[in-house]
Amino acid sequence: MLGVFGLSACDDIDDFTTSPNNLLTFSTDTVRIDTVFSTVPSSMHDFWVSNRSGKGLRCTSVRLEGGNQNGFRVNVDGVYLSPEQGYKANGIEVRNKDSIRVFVEVTTAVNHGDAPKELNDRLVFALESGVEQKVVLNAWSWDADFVRNKTITTDYTITAGKPLVVYGPLTVEEGATLTIAPGATLYFHDGAGIDVKGRLVCKGTADQPVTLRGDRLDRMFDYLPYDRMSGLWNGIHFLEKSYDNRMEFTDLHSAFHGVRVDSSDVARQTLTIANSTIHNCQGHALYVEKSKVTVENSQLTNALNNCLGVDGGDVQVNNCTLAQFYPFDSNRASALNFSALKHPLQQFVCRNTLITGYSADEMMGGKPVKDATGEDAAEPNAFNYKFENCVIRTPEVTDEEELPHFVNVVFEEKENADSVCTNHFKKVDGDKQDYDFRLAKTSVAIDRADPATATKTDRNAIPRDERPDVGAYEFKEEKTEEPNPQE
């Protein structure tokens, strides 16, 4: 039952009318609940019913026209339209210059189909005058498969088809491989995620990517889907004995930590990420601790912590876009943070990569100079790194000892953040959390990559030209239709 309370603020004495000329006013004519998974309750929606007619109005009944055939639940001014009352309430009053609030939820039945099904009902306000006023209730119901606290102990493949909604941890045990097939989408509930002790292979393609996202299909505001919010699920965690993992053409977004990689044997490849996106995370987008990881043609963007955080290991990055425009907290960290504070950094090689964001310095490096006691380290951890043909928003390196680590690097000017957004990318809209990190024609990243080391195609499998661009996306001039002179 919807536990809500009605609001009343009116004259003690009101003159009620039965004239058909006096009508209620509604804040909306249609309550749209968007898409919900069948059998899963929706979030609550509401609207106001006001009386500006000059006289008090009394409803002989307020009822669901279809009863409960489509699963809508309604509370009118604190009165639940219960099945015991025939999904209606009698004698609802709206005094002159007063308003009441109506709350609506829906839980839909299974549709027995693959496509979303539209559901409609109407909430009927029958006035004492005999006039009936109606508000449409609209929702879409989508059948899904559900897994709860699932543990995978043998090789298993998740195929495209029905949406898969995950509750709790999805654990891949040591010795098992979880394969996610092209076109599959996994929807993770709050607190759910993938814990990989064995092996994970996301086999997306340019035409059929793998999508890993939260399970909220509704909107926070009319202009803002919940899917654009961060921290909706727990992301992917690769544990210390997990090796040979691969994520290709995978879109992972709106998690807490996107991908975490625990400390492991640096002599073995733990993870390869190619042609993928990790976006809008409330923790790190990608955090690597003393592991061997390769990232190429990928977008790591918008995280409260670092878009890419590295502590030790062997990490190679090529043709990636690391962009820190996280909108929800001004204390966001950097686009890139690499260090050897806890573990030796055997090598960190970053080629043909765009590193930028709101801050004037979006790259942080942690060189070990102290030991665990805080004293000067006699033999500090190895700290080997190199940047080649990159564009980096950081103060220009002039120290002679540091210069050999930066080859053909463009250090961005200290322009304001808005200029960085518009100069580099097609769209950065923090208000609507709407982003397009493909290059704008004004970006200095265009034609700056090394043809010898750049990837042959970009994040979206678009071929790079003979003068490839820095970052995950190759710039292509968008064709505009020529005006028809006869029109």
Language model segments and positions:
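Carboxylate-dense, calcium-coordinating segments in secreted/extracellular and ER-lumen proteins
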Residues: 465-472
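Cytochrome P450 C-terminal beta-domain/meander region
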Residues: 460-464
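Beta-strand/loop edge motif enriched in small/polar residues
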Residues: 11-17, 24-35, 40-42, 46, ...
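C-terminal motif of bacterial Sec signal peptides marking the signal peptidase cleavage site
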Residues: 5-9
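Short, solvent-exposed loop/linker segments at beta-strand-coil boundaries, enriched for Pro/Gly
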Residues: 65-87
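Short acidic/proline- and small/hydrophobic-mixed sequence motifs that coincide with surface turns
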Residues: 42-44, 54-59
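Asparagine-centered strand-capping/turn motif at beta-strand->loop junctions
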Residues: 49-53
